């Protein structure tokens, strides 16, 4: 069993902790709690770089080792880092669990050392017709991020 964690930080008052677990070659389970967000859907992605020297802007594009277009988590054509949306309640918090087979914690495609980012707006899952739909899901600004680190 491989475990990882990302502690989210933000200049906008958003905070949270995201846990990742993977058993062998099974899909990775992602469990998180985030607070300080506006109610509604927020894009949630693994970004390519674990660099926060310039805040969340330094994390690069969505993690996309296969060079595909942006899509929904259940789509065949998607970035590996496309994890869809998290749903934030009226109290500004989100608690969620998801599983995904394209974000392993071990091996050459590992997401350890990369970043997880919560966006200001909903991810249109590549289906919105906006000029950014096929690259970012038109999910808006980066409101919180954290580097995915290995846990003991």
UniProtKB/Swiss-Prot annotation:
Intracellular or extracellular location(s): Cytoplasm
Induction: By sulfhydryl-containing molecules such as glutathione, DDT, and cysteine.
E.C. code: 1.15.1.1
Residues engaged in binding Cu cation: 45, 47, 62, 119
Residues given in the record as Zn(2+) binding sites: 62, 70, 79, 82
UniProt remark on cofactor binding: Binds 1 copper ion per subunit.
Pfam families named among the record's database cross-references: Sod_Cu
GO molecular function: copper ion binding; superoxide dismutase activity
Top-rank taxon: Eukaryota
Residue pairs linked by disulfide bridges in the UniProt entry: 56-145
Reaction equation(s) it catalyzes: 2 superoxide + 2 H(+) = H2O2 + O2
GO cellular component: cytoplasm
Gene3D superfamilies, A to Z: Superoxide dismutase, copper/zinc binding domain
Sorted UniProt keywords: Antioxidant, Copper, Cytoplasm, Disulfide bond, Metal-binding, Oxidoreductase, Zinc
Keyword check for Zinc-finger: no
Cofactor(s) essential for the protein: Cu cation; Zn(2+)
Enzyme's top EC category: oxidoreductase
Function text: Destroys radicals which are normally produced within the cells and which are toxic to biological systems.
Subunit structure: Homodimer.
Protein family: Belongs to the Cu-Zn superoxide dismutase family.
Listed name of the protein: Superoxide dismutase [Cu-Zn]
Species assigned in the record: Nicotiana plumbaginifolia
């Amino acid at each position: 069993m491989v475990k990882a964690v990302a502690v989210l930080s933000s200049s906008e008052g958003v905070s949270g902790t995201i846990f990742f677990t993977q058993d062998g070659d099974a899909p990775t389970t992602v469990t998180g709690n985030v607070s300080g967000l506006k109610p509604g859907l927020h894009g949630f992605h693994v970004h390519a770089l674990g660099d926060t020297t310039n805040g969340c802007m330094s994390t690069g594009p969505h993690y996309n080792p296969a060079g595909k277009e942006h899509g929904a988590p259940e789509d065949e054509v998607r970035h590996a880092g496309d994890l869809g949306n998290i749903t934030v309640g009226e109290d500004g918090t989100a608690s969620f669990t998801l599983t995904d087979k394209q974000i392993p914690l071990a091996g050459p495609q590992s997401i350890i050392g990369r970043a997880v980012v919560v966006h200001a707006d909903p991810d249109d899952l590549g289906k919105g017709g906006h000029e950014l739909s096929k690259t970012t899901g038109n999910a808006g600004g980066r409101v919180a991020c954290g580097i995915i680190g290995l846990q003991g």
